[in-house]
A protein has these predicted regions:
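Extended, alpha-helix-rich binding/interface surfaces that flank or overlap catalytic cores
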Residues: 259-274
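Active-site mouth of glycoside hydrolases
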Residues: 24-185, 189
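Extracellular glycoside hydrolase catalytic/binding regions
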Residues: 128, 144-259, 263
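Positively charged, low-complexity intrinsically disordered regions
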Residues: 4-5, 17, 23-25, 32
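Bacterial N-terminal signal peptides that target proteins for export
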Residues: 1-9
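Hydrophobic h-region of N-terminal signal peptides that target proteins for export
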Residues: 10-20
Length: 274
């Protein structure tokens, strides 16, 4: 009798945990994600505000670039690596508490090419340090984490880093974003492909994770046409609804270089699915 009672309790706990896990990523059941991808380390209080509102509104994923453009002078130093690990572990805990996916893009293959004001080193020059970022992700564990090793893969070094991450992160859900951000398929070893459409009205494949990581669409979805601006809720809602009708699995809004709380855009993402 006692044994049966405890078994029933365990079954109820298992059902409860399953019910509150991150939603499955699948075509025909669109979910929306948000992230201040290059400014996520600016303020933990802003992150708390964002994550709490996302949970309330049904926004199911937070997106970051681990090699963040946070304006620091010591980027790629040992001190920066340690600080990045602390920030990542904190955010990972907060996302797990709320059952929100953490989408981690480790590096961008555009780095060091001067795009959007990036004057740092190329991946080739900081390759070993970049591998330390992959190790940070590994140490955090795979639960609730989706990893894009390289954004917009386009160089031999980026391809090599991608393959090394496949080995380091073999138990993780991996996303491919090769061919400069417009992959035509999902290669072996990856679970999904992410595409970066140029415009709100750009055609995308049904099976892709659709992320607004392109200079043109970032401007189109912003309130004033800028790269460092908050979102335009009406345009964001229209974009999400269009892709939901198509049945894509994920629509992700990149708050590219915005460093403040943007509740109107987060609400627009969630309400667009209703």
């Amino acid at each position: 009798m006692v044994r049966r009672y405890y078994l029933s309790i365990l079954a109820m706990v298992a059902l409860h945990l399953g019910a509150i896990a991150q939603p499955r990523i699948e075509q025909g059941n669109t979910q929306v994600w948000y992230g201040r991808v290059n400014q996520w380390t600016v303020s933990r209080q802003i992150l708390r505000n964002e994550l709490n509102l996302m949970k309330e509104c049904g926004v199911n994923g937070y997106m970051i670039e681990l090699a963040v453009w946070d304006g620091v002078d010591d980027k790629w130093s040992n001190e920066w690596i340690v600080r990045t690990q602390k920030n990542y572990r904190w955010l990972l805990r907060e996302c797990r508490k709320r059952k929100i996916w953490l989408f981690v893009s480790i590096i961008n293959d555009n780095m060091g090419k001067g795009k959007y004001g990036d004057t740092g080193p190329t991946l080739e020059k900081v390759y070993e340090s970049a591998l330390q970022l992959a190790s940070i992700v590994k140490r955090g564990g795979s639960k609730g984490v989706i990893v894009q090793p390289v954004a917009e893969t386009q160089t031999p070094t980026g391809q090599r880093f991608e393959q090394e991450c496949r080995k380091i992160l073999e138990n993780f859900t991996l996303v491919y974003n090769g061919e400069g951000g417009h992959p035509k398929s999902t290669p072996e070893g990856f679970h999904f492909r992410a595409v970066h459409p140029a415009h709100i009205v750009s055609s995308v494949a049904d099976d892709a994770l659709v992320i607004s990581d392109h200079g043109l669409i970032i401007r189109e979805l912003s309130i004033d046409g800028g790269l460092e601006s908050r979102g335009n809720p009406q345009k964001v809602s229209m974009w999400v609804k269009r892709l939901q009708q198509q049945g894509v699995a994920v629509v992700g809004y990149y708050a590219f270089k915005y460093d403040k709380f943007d509740p109107a855009t987060i609400r627009a993402l969630g309400e667009a699915l209703k």
